[in-house]
């Protein structure tokens, strides 16, 4: 089963998350099928904190991918994505 979730990147104490489509059995930061977007919780005021490709999100949900609760919450809290 394919799931859309966060994969952690960045360095220690400075997280940066990629929003990825991956197999549910893979580890959090393991191989993924496609990178759909990103989330930067420490973005400066001039930077964009989150970006997601809506067309790819629609495609993956259309073929049966589940969205993790965290990604659902991020999408609801950032409607301008």
Swiss-Prot record:
HAMAP family assigned: Ribosomal_bS16
Organism: Polynucleobacter asymbioticus (strain DSM 18221 / CIP 109841 / QLW-P1DMWA-1) (Polynucleobacter necessarius subsp. asymbioticus)
GO CC entries: cytoplasm; small ribosomal subunit
InterPro entries: Ribosomal_bS16 (IPR000307), Ribosomal_bS16_dom_sf (IPR023803)
Family membership noted in the UniProt record: Belongs to the bacterial ribosomal protein bS16 family.
GO terms, molecular function: structural constituent of ribosome
Keywords carried by this UniProt record: Ribonucleoprotein, Ribosomal protein
Protein's UniProt name: Small ribosomal subunit protein bS16
Superkingdom field: Bacteria
GO biological process, one term: translation
């Amino acid at each position: 089963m394919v799931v859309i979730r966060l994969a952690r990147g960045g360095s220690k104490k400075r997280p940066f998350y990629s929003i990825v489509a991956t197999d549910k059995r893979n580890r959090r930061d393991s191989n993924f099928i496609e990178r759909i977007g990103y989330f930067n919780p420490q973005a400066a005021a001039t930077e964009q904190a989150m970006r997601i490709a809506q067309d790819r999100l629609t495609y993956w949900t259309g073929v049966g991918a589940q969205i993790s609760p965290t990604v659902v919450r991020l999408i609801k809290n950032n409607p301008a994505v």
